């Protein structure tokens, strides 16, 4: 009968493979490095991930581990909690707030509001006014 330690290692390695396989939708070279190896848990991606499948919760230690391997990449942790199956989309992910804001500002920058040229309502520049549905952009 396999030991509990072997079961945990197998679960950790399986979780790394599940996450790597899920990431292949966007990063076709994503590969799990295998449980227990030093360095990044998944290679072939533009960020550093530490994958955890554990019952204890040590977020600060885990993020420090991810950061120690990051080599200039943004680091984060993917955590498979007890009771979660093998759907990586459902796993938790966390990172430092400063790193998250860098990503969010690229995707959704804080644009200053301006007045719509048609109705005078507030809107974000170069977008459609939510009041008159026209405004700051050319609809032609």
Where are these regions (language model features)?
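Catalytic phosphate/metal-binding cores of nucleic-acid and nucleotide-processing enzymes, i.e., regions
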Residues: 1-140
